[in-house]
Amino acid sequence: MPIRVLDELPAVNFLREENVFVMTTSRASGQEIRPLKVLILNLMPKKIETENQFLRLLSNSPLQVDVQLLRIDARESRNTPAEHLNNFYCNFEDICDQNFDGLIVTGAPLGLVEFNDVAYWPQIKQVLEWAKDHVTSTLFVCWAVQAALNILYGIPKQTRTDKLSGVYEHHILHPHALLTRGFDDSFLAPHSRYADFPAALIRDYTDLEILAETEDGDAYLFASKDKRIAFVTGHPEYDAHTLASEYFRDVEAGLSPNVPYNYFPKNDPQNKPRATWRSHGNLLFTNWLNYYVYQITPYDLRHMNPTLD
């Protein structure tokens, strides 16, 4: 899917170097089709890196995706230039009267922070409530899953003693589910989280359908039956080097982190890691865009009435 972004966004050149099809706004304006409108609420500190990761996954289909970047944290960023945020991000007040085909809420490094201590917790709740009436389908990633489960279902925060970091095996539970269509029976995906997602807890608190689990019984991929919300507890968007960057950052900070599981060749951090989850990540996002967004979203977004027909 050619992603449609502003001509000056740094991701344009970065992704083109990877042979990813990026369509700038100036070129897209000449095509007489309605693009899918996808809003990305980027909660990660290194926003440009995260933009590249998600835009890459949204790019592989013949339909246009018009991407809008959203921020809700008004504090000065230490990792992203203010000029970049001012040029390419909108505030919630700018888009609250609009409707969108899809919304992606990224993870955030807040696993050890209580929800009420998160600086923008009220804004998170506001966006999730707004999305019920203004977005066809929302995809939550990693920490955003934990936040959404608390806001939407009242599930208390579950925190692991040690951080889960590495590339783990998962298995699908419903081979014919649309979101897992084309998945291998077992597949790899990276995790980097303190949050805990026991499948039994999610079944007890919600009517969400768990579609894939880790080998230890943690929920990895689950969704509502009406396709309006979907959750992925790992990081299928991560680059090959992302877990390594996090690991060496924590080493330098004196945190004595565990070496990410099943990640470095021969479990040696001096060896260059390889991405073993790219095909899974691409297929997951393609399925979400096709079956959870495109096939149920209304043609006229002024009348938000998703249908399963």
UniProtKB/Swiss-Prot annotation:
The active site is at C142 (acyl-thioester intermediate), H235 (proton acceptor), E237. The record marks S192 as: Important for substrate specificity. The keyword S-adenosyl-L-methionine does not apply. GO terms for cellular component: cytoplasm. It catalyses: L-homoserine + succinyl-CoA = O-succinyl-L-homoserine + CoA. GO terms for molecular function: homoserine O-acetyltransferase activity; homoserine O-succinyltransferase activity. Keywords: Acyltransferase, Amino-acid biosynthesis, Cytoplasm, Methionine biosynthesis, Transferase. InterPro entries: Class_I_gatase-like, HST_MetA, MetA_family. One of its GO terms (biological process) is L-methionine biosynthetic process from homoserine via O-succinyl-L-homoserine and cystathionine. The record marks G111 as: Important for acyl-CoA specificity. Substrate binds at K163, S192, R249. It is found in: Cytoplasm. Its EC number is 2.3.1.46. Pathway: Amino-acid biosynthesis; L-methionine biosynthesis via de novo pathway; O-succinyl-L-homoserine from L-homoserine: step 1/1. The keyword Acyltransferase applies. Its main location: cytoplasm. Transfers a succinyl group from succinyl-CoA to L-homoserine, forming succinyl-L-homoserine. Belongs to the MetA family. NCBIfam families: metA. This is Homoserine O-succinyltransferase. It comes from Citrobacter koseri (strain ATCC BAA-895 / CDC 4225-83 / SGSC4696). The gene is metAS.
